Amino acid sequence: MDNMNNNILLIMLAGILAMLFSFWKTSWINKQSQGNDRMESIGSSIADGAMAFLRAEYRILTVFVIAVAFILGYANSGRSDSSAIISLSFVIGALASGLAGFLGMKVATKANNRTTHAAESSLARALNVAFSGGSVMGLSVVGLGVLGLGGLLYLYSNMYGFENSSAVSMVLNILSGFSLGASSIALFARVGGGIYTKAADVGADLVGKVEAGIPEDHPLNPATIADNVGDNVGDVAGMGADLFESYVGSIIGSMVLGSSILVAGGMDLNFVILPLLIAASGIVVSILGTFMVSVKEGGDPQKGLNQGEFGSGLIMVGVIYVLIVKILPESYFQGGVSYNSTGVFYATIIGLFGGLGIGKITEHYTGTGTKPVKSIAEQSMTGPATNIIAGLGVGMESTAVPMIIISASIMGAVSYTHLTLPTIYSV
């Protein structure tokens, strides 16, 4: 149990490191020049609008979270496999998800005009400011995720014990409330923010092009501010909450399934804690990866981003191998059959490279100057009808390869783990 607590504290330390790095990046962004008065004025208007939306949304969500927490606590009170304290997990999950979105959007609205000003003199500096703003969102998501999960796991494991299967089952059931809280916020933030974004976008089009005869993004069009507010609300706060929910859900799901693996006739808690350890290690590697992102003047920013992404991925392969070799036994039992733990490593690596592959495919179908994007642009020359048809066709085509990658990843993970539960580590 002492070893378990030490591992949890290390996991929480990684979360604290992520938050400290985020605050450092935020401080650096605040020190950058905001540009001329016009840039500062527009940036301030966008920031004010984004925060006004978020305040209104969070006021409504507060009522929802309190009501659902009460229902969850009442429904789980007196149960042998759960507890009313699941409502605490739910509330903390909702708070963490909301906070991740708030921090990300706060920094994004500060980085907007600073990136514009930096781009006047240097592409490399503009990328640095923009990427720093994005890294705050990403590291806030993972930092709050492992902090919340690690803190609650430490609390519940000491409250209910973590020595037998029934205690572990209860702790994980209660912990799942954290994921439910995150999912609840993600639903409202993503859908609500997305609807606002599209409404503002179409409104800007109608007002500008139809009524006033001015471009959509012209500063004289008041709907332009609302459109940019929507971009921050939907694509930063909403996306952040969505990623937080997916991140937390995949970790908890792996922990629950890992609890059923037997070693020497009993449960091995290392299979339960492994997903959190991998996530915590990923935070440290991701921070290192931010220093790999760079671009020369006149270079391609996407190549600079790919450097950090694939560099981090390669480092993570070695980290995962060391973790699995150090903390997992050489063999485990599932369904009465013995298997080798190296299968867990292969399943995890397959999932890692599957994700990187999907990212590259997405870049191919949406990146600047790529063949699919150029084909859509060429169709625009003959009218909106052909443009819509081409865009729809490319969009449908773009789903094929990711589906193949996902299917191949599942089959590959299954082949190495022989259709046992460690296959789930490929997430």
Residue ranges of model-derived segments:
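Hydrophobic packing and interface segments
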Residues: D2-L421, S426
